[in-house]
C-alpha cells in the first residue's frame, strides 16, 4: 500500500493514509480522503475535524481505540478537491479489504461523498444522515462530516444528535 502507484495522486502525496484503530472494531468510520495534516502525519482525522470527531465519538460512548477510521481515498487530492472516479476505482480494493478484514457491525459514513460511495446511491447526506441503512450485510449509519460543523454551526446539533443515536444503536436502545 505504501508504494501504491495505481493513480496520479501518488505523485503529490507525502505518504499513504491507510487507516487507524481497532482491527476488531464494531464500528468502521469512513471519511472521504486525507487532508493536508493527514497526509503529513499518515493518520486520518488529525486536524480540527479530527479533534471534533473525538468529541463526537465520546457522545456515542466511544473513543478512537474502539473504532477503526479510514477514508475512501488513501492519498490526498490536490487542494482538497473531490475525488475523481478513476481515483476511487484505484482505491476501492483497499477499502474493500479493510472492510472484509475488520468485519464491522456498523459502517459510519462521514459526509456526502463516502455515504454515496458506500450505499451506491445518488441520495445525499442531507436526506440520509441519522438513518440506519444497509449495504450488503453491513448496517450503515450516514452522518455529516465533522468538518461541516466547523463551517456551518447548524450542522453541529445534527452531528451531535446523530452520534448520540449511534451510541443508542450500539447499546441496543433503538
Please state what every model-predicted region is.
Residues 1-174:
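A polyanion-binding, active-site-adjacent surface
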Amino acid at each position: 500500500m505504501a508504494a501504491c502507484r495505481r493513480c496520479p495522486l501518488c505523485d503529490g502525496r507525502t505518504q499513504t493514509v491507510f487507516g487507524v484503530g481497532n482491527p476488531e472494531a464494531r464500528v468502521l468510520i469512513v471519511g472521504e480522503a486525507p487532508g493536508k495534516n493527514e497526509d503529513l502525519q499518515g493518520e486520518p482525522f488529525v486536524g480540527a475535524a479530527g479533534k471534533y470527531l473525538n468529541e463526537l465519538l465520546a457522545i456515542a460512548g466511544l473513543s478512537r481505540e474502539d473504532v477503526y477510521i479510514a477514508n475512501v481515498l488513501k492519498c490526498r487530492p490536490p487542494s482538497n478537491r473531490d475525488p475523481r472516479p478513476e481515483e476511487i476505482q484505484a482505491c476501492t480494493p483497499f477499502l474493500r479489504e479493510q472492510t472484509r478484514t475488520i468485519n464491522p457491525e456498523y459502517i459510519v459514513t462521514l459526509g456526502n461523498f463516502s455515504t454515496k460511495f458506500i450505499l451506491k446511491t445518488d441520495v445525499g447526506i442531507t436526506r440520509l444522515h441519522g438513518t440506519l441503512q444497509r449495504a450488503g450485510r453491513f448496517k450503515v449509519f450516514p452522518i455529516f462530516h465533522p468538518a461541516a460543523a466547523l463551517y456551518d454551526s447548524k450542522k453541529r446539533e445534527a452531528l451531535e444528535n446523530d452520534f448520540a443515536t449511534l451510541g443508542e444503536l450500539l447499546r441496543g436502545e433503538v
